[in-house]
């Protein structure tokens, strides 16, 4: 390719490189002007033409920059503050005395074993599920929790209705005998809400199960099972066969792995082909909730699901890779099937449409469940089912998503994408994308920042793979990397290129409403409650999401957030200071050495105890000695 391109560059037109003239739009050709003569891209190409033509090089198109080592002048967080960051972020608690002592003694070397302990806490798995929902938004589908199950295939999905105290009563009697304030109606409402919450949690419980048991994280696309609770098992119609496997059959949030049988209709007739007799589970790929969250239509033809597949599991946003079509109307008029014939369309649809075909058995367009092949068969005006030039064998059709999951797990892009998810969980920011504007004077600095970060991501991905895809290893590697430990700059940076390199380095971020509530609980011993309560109006205002209409966490503070912070500071301070003084001094969290005899302006001992209390508060609230 280089030889052919060099030959083309050496060809002259009116004494000037034909390549340079065409690309500048001087010659009549279909591509028109591609680069302006004064652009950086043109200068780089002109330099290449001179070099292959044997002419002297007049220097780089962009001035050289003598870059220092990337983290030169960047200060790292002391081990004790790093420990506090880890335990608050991942386990919603302050470090224990033993953990602080271990770090004081062994420094960063102690962090590894402490992380092992942190990642056994239930709070870590709450955080893990919450964070992966931020990425997958799987809780945001329409129709309530049981809406993921079709009434046609799961006739017990509304099992809770048989337990309603209002069952069999007329509307008048229902309101008269069992108003919503009646204890039985309150209990019934809780049962329904717990069932729906369990259904919403199922895909996230799969993630937690894989990580908790240190199973290969590839199982998020290959697991031949789902997670069910005593309540959701009733929805699937499998509770009777599983009830002895639950530790507490009345716990709506105890989840165990199981398989469900291939689907039948309400009359028991087989509607799903299966060589094993079971539903062909493939982790999240075949999850009822995941497919319900990303539905399809007659015009979309599973392409939304394909976009999410590439984004969530391979780290590729197909929309960013798609070329911009100059004249869509002209292409539509010129080709009978543009998506299979027009070069501008084929470049994307050749990748997208075969994967869409793998989902053809999950083609419900009326919002009722997710399973059901298209009545008229799959579309003929789309590329055949498969993945990246590998066609789906006919005998694998019944398990097409398992076939896809097996190949996804072997794709080298999968571990990188998973490490990028961990990056987002820990930093609250998405990894850098390669800069595109080559004319940007800071392009080389931004490219270096991207490349160094990408190298670290790929390094961690390699360690992740060597550890048999144990996601805990990815967390441990990233927590101990310079990116997570950055604490600030040793001195002011004046060079604009250096500032551009370090622009995304550091961990200044807004806590989510859920994280802030957990931090308040860890510091003060009880939650505030007004950020995450079911009926709270503050959650969205403070940057929360509902996974449906609001899907992006806020990264910049707003006026509403400032107002909420003022309300919170007054509430938390008034409530917890008074509560702390009602306890015995030895049980206090905030003022362990202050009693009624200690007053400002008192004797030397009182002044010393006040100073000691300020130091204690500074350490407990801010984590600074």
Could you say what each language-model-derived stretch is?
Residues 1, 13-16, 21, 27-45, ...:
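Sequence context surrounding c-type heme c attachment/ligation sites in exported
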Residues 19, 82-90, 114-119, 128-136, ...:
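Short alpha-helical scaffolding segments that buttress acidic/His motifs in well-ordered protein cores
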Residues 33-34, 61-62, 97-102, 128-134, ...:
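Short coil/turn segments at secondary-structure boundaries
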Residues 55, 93-97, 124-126, 137-145, ...:
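Secretory-pathway/luminal and periplasmic proteins that interact with or process carbohydrate-rich
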Residues 56-77, 83-93, 98-121, 361-389, ...:
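Substrate/cofactor-recognition hotspot
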Residues 74-83, 107-110, 120, 124, ...:
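Secondary-structure capping and boundary motifs in well-ordered enzyme cores
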Residues 129-236, 240, 250-262, 269-276, ...:
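Non-catalytic, conformational "gating/processing" segments within enzyme and secreted inhibitor domains
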């Amino acid at each position: 390719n280089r030889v052919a391109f060099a030959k083309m560059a050496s060809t002259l037109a009116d004494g000037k490189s034909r390549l340079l003239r065409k690309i500048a739009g001087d010659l009549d050709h279909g591509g028109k002007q591609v680069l302006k003569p004064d652009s950086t891209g043109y200068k780089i190409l002109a330099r290449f033409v001179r070099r292959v033509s044997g002419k002297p090089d007049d220097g780089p198109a962009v001035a050289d920059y003598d870059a220092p080592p990337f983290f030169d002048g960047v200060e790292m967080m002391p081990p004790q503050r790093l420990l506090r960051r880890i335990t608050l972020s991942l386990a919603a608690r302050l470090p224990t005395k033993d953990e602080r002592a271990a770090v004081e003694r062994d420094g960063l070397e102690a962090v590894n074993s402490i992380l092992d302990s942190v990642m056994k806490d239930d709070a870590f798995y709450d955080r893990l599920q919450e964070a992966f929902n931020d990425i997958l938004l799987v809780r945001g589908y329409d129709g309530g929790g049981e809406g993921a199950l079709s009434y046609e295939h799961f006739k017990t999905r509304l099992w809770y209705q048989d337990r309603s105290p209002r069952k069999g009563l007329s509307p008048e009697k229902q309101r008269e005998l069992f108003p919503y304030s009646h204890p039985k109606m309150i209990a019934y409402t809780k049962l329904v809400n717990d069932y729906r919450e369990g259904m919403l949690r199922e895909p996230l419980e799969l993630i937690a199960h894989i990580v908790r048991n240190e199973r290969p994280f590839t199982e998020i696309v290959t697991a031949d099972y789902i997670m069910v609770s005593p309540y959701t098992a009733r929805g699937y119609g499998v509770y009777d066969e599983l009830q002895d496997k639950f530790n507490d059959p009345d716990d709506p949030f105890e989840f165990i792995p199981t398989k469900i049988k291939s689907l039948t209709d309400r009359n028991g007739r087989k509607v799903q082909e299966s060589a094993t007799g079971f539903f062909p589970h493939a982790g999240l790929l075949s999850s009822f909730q995941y497919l319900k969250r990303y539905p399809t239509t007659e015009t979309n033809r599973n392409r939304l699901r394909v976009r999410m597949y590439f984004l969530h599991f391979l780290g590729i946003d197909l929309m960013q890779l798609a070329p911009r079509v100059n004249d869509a109307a002209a292409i539509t008029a010129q080709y009978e099937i543009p998506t299979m014939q027009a070069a501008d369309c084929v470049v994307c649809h050749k990748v997208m449409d075969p994967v869409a075909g793998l989902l053809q058995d999950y083609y419900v367009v009326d919002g009722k469940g997710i399973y059901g092949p298209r009545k008229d068969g799959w579309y003929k005006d789309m590329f055949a089912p498969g993945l990246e030039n590998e066609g789906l064998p006919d005998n694998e059709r019944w398990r097409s998503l398992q076939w896809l999951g097996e190949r996804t797990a072997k794709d080298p892009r999968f571990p990188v994408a998973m490490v990028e998810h961990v990056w987002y969980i820990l930093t609250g920011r998405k990894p850098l994308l390669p800069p595109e504007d080559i004319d940007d004077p800071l392009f080389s600095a931004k490219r270096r920042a991207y490349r160094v970060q990408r190298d670290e991501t790929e390094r961690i991905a390699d360690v992740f793979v060597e550890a048999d895809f144990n996601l805990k290893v990815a967390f441990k590697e990233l927590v101990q990397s310079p990116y997570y430990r950055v604490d600030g700059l040793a001195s002011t940076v004046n060079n604009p290129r250096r500032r551009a390199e370090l622009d995304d380095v550091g961990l200044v971020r807004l806590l989510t409403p859920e994280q802030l509530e957990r931090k308040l609980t860890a510091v003060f011993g009880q939650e505030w409650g007004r950020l995450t309560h079911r009926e709270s109006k503050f959650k969205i205002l403070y940057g929360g999401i509902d996974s449906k209409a609001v899907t992006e966490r806020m990264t910049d503070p707003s006026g509403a957030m400032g107002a909420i912070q003022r309300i919170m500071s007054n509430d938390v301070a008034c409530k917890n200071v008074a509560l702390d003084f009602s306890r015995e001094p030895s049980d206090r969290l905030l003022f362990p050495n202050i009693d009624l005899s200690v007053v400002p302006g008192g004797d030397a001992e009182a002044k010393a105890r006040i100073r000691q209390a300020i130091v204690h508060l500074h350490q407990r609230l801010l984590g600074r000695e």
